[in-house]
């Protein structure tokens, strides 16, 4: 048992030893004490808790008491009113007799198996890099898969847009055919009307739709090139990462499930609740997830979102233009049908007028012939001997009456006046008949023009309905655009070619 020596702190005058001797002894003792503390601390520096550094400004025993306070058991109240002591949570060795649980100590060097530990750490680093490469390859592969899906959707939408653009171009050809076919009407039927205005309006609208569809095709082509370039970049980085994990048997989808998501581009999808998702590793120039991979994934995400918006806009434009083109075509056909109905009404009215005029001409001709017969009867016979006795002016009764002055008979004068009046009436009838025939011919020609105009409008409507059918392609509609008049026979070269 140690014996406590009496204190050597006495009055300076009562000391026997020299002051230098006392100071030398105290210095030696202090040096030994510091060496003891340092050696004691250094003895456990290779094996101690991580947070075992005490505050130098606090007394050693107070710092140690504060440091050991969290080790003690905690008293908890039970529902029945009793108490129970439980060790604190966390790692450590539970000392049930001392009611304490000190934290686990960690060695700075894994002695005595330092070589094995370093080899294991190296293997862990290599496996961590392989896992990172596999996870990055899985994310790159899934991003490439989604970009491929978006490429397929974009190609399908481009085909639909191209078909709609072909329909718009075919509509322009049909409009040109309609204008050209309506140009074969007679001159009197070429007076500008609302149908011509509708055809001009249709042409302008179709040109506007064509420009819009061509812009959509240019946008989709640029997006297609960007998606293809992004896919190639993702494929290059994915194949580069797969070189490090080529011999691993864990599928890439399983790696994504371990990461807590089924996609690395579409981050809007909630993670799978059954697995604990791994955090996105920060880009490391010398690691598996390089800044180039991060940039490629960010570009894929941006292109995916942009392509979704562009695809929706392209589909909307395609449907709108289809409806607009159908509406414009219906309005043009309705205007042509209205013009046909108006032409048919005029044809019926002109046919009735032509029939009435024909009857009038027949009656006038009959009356004119009767007037000529009457004029011949009024003139009398050509020979004097054919005159009747009552028509002779030299008969005895007339000669006896005309013997006195002023008793001349007006028979001859009145006969001459009546004959002249009948002659003038016949001439007027001839003039009226000539005018009636001229008007009849003009009316018949106008009726024929109306019939041709009606037939041309009917052919235009029929042509439009036939050419606008979806089964008629652009090349078939283009064959009808020729430079020769369809009312004339085609050139011999074309005839010979067709016969062959």
Curated annotation (Swiss-Prot):
Modified residues (Phosphotyrosine): 372
UniProt record, GO biological process: flagellated sperm motility
Protein location: Cytoplasm, Cytoskeleton, Flagellum axoneme
Gene Ontology CC: one annotated term: axonemal B tubule inner sheath
Pfam families from the UniProt entry: Tektin
Keyword Phosphoprotein annotated: yes
Coiled-coil stretches: 198-229, 422-448
Keyword Coiled coil found: yes
Keywords tagged on the record: Cell projection, Cilium, Coiled coil, Cytoplasm, Cytoskeleton, Flagellum, Phosphoprotein
Region listing for Disordered, in residue ranges: 1-25, 265-286
Disulfide bonds: none
Subcellular location, principal: cytoplasm
InterPro entries membership: Tektin-like, TEKTL1
Positions of modified residues (Phosphoserine): 14
Record note on quaternary structure: Microtubule inner protein component of sperm flagellar doublet microtubules.
Described purpose of this protein according to its UniProt entry: Microtubule inner protein (MIP) part of the dynein-decorated doublet microtubules (DMTs) in sperm flagellar axoneme, which is required for motile flagellum beating. Forms an extensive interaction network cross-linking the lumen of axonemal doublet microtubules.
Protein name: Tektin-like protein 1
Species whose genome carries this gene: Rattus norvegicus (Rat)
